[in-house]
Amino acid sequence: MSIANPPHSAAGSVNLDPTIPAPMANATNVAEYGFEGRFVDWADDARYFEYSKAANPIGSGHAPQVPIRQFGPDIYTDQPTGIVPLDLSRELGINNGEATSPALLASFVRIRAGEQIDTAVNATSQLYYVLYGRGFAAVDGRLVKFEKGDFLTLPAGARSVFYADAETAMYWVHDAPLLRYLGAEAREPRFRATKFARADAVAKLEDIANRPGANDKSRVSVLLANENQEQSLTITHVLWAMFGVLPAAQEQRPHRHQSVALDLILDAPPSGCYTLLGTRLDERGEIVDPIRVDWQAGGAFTTPPGMWHAHYNETDTPAHLIPIQDAGLQTYLRSLDIKFTQRRDLVVG
């Protein structure tokens, strides 16, 4: 068995100049290594781009951007037992399954009283919020009750069936689209199944909202977290969830982040609560040429990554919302890049 000596420069070191080919060597005899057959070149799928043609496929429009889309409660109200996916896969250029964002799928789950539904999915993280109703879930042989206002999170490998004692609707978000993109199967749980009871979440939110200066903050909210997420401080290692209130006659100033938000609106008045979204701020920190999304109680909408967004309540009634994001993953990757208008290092525009 012979091994060719590595090429050396005049100084005696290995020559790493890629424009100089390797010196000719004797053909490799694969039989000496215990193999049969011939080499393949694996070049059929190789492509080469000049840098400026492929450095920013999102900005150039080659990769579709996440759209702003709104979903009303009519798509699940008075429907039979079933899952109603908020599917934007066609707009996102995703052809291997349903998706609301590149990494997440949000759905409304409707369960008629006395009926049940299986929600097993290949995902590392699942989050359920109970819009209304009550019942119990059987998860890997264990039973847990749920009712209006509860949050439930399930880890990888969970087998779940939900049973409704009353007419029930839930908002369900999971990361199956991310797993499909990676070609992976979720097997190892990264957290334990967890329930965030309505009474506990509401009590914490009311405590925060009643503190002096609460309305001076960017958001009046509770961030739900799991004790296993010591670095990201999020509800799972992939998902992030906020339970917030938009007080009467208040504005919550613009901020932005690189995670996609799948926003669920709870008890908003019929009109007067809305979100403004845009890509730039003016010198006063206001969104330039904003797109307006009027809130619908029981509805949802998407907030694309990187867009400034601010919430407004022009009524005398508070409104509640639950944004859910892939910010757990983004935080782990150190790519969340959240910015607030009051930050001194903010560069407008």
Feature-to-residue mapping (PLM):
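Hydrophobic alpha-helical segments and helix pairs
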Residues: 161-198
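A short, N-terminal "cap"/entry segment at the start of jelly-roll beta-barrel domains
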Residues: 2-101, 183-243, 346-349
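C-terminal functional regions that serve as terminal interaction/effector modules
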Residues: 6-8, 12-67, 78, 260-349
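A short beta-strand-loop-beta hairpin characteristic of the jelly-roll/cupin
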Residues: 112, 116-148, 265-297
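Conserved short histidine dyad/triad with adjacent acidic residue
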Residues: 83-95, 104-122, 240-260, 307
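Short, low-complexity cationic-aromatic patches
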Residues: 27, 39, 97-101, 115-126, ...
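Intrinsic, low-complexity N-terminal interaction/targeting segments
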Residues: 98, 103-108, 117, 126-127, ...
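Conserved metal-binding segment of the jelly-roll/cupin
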Residues: 112, 145-166, 173-176, 292-315, ...
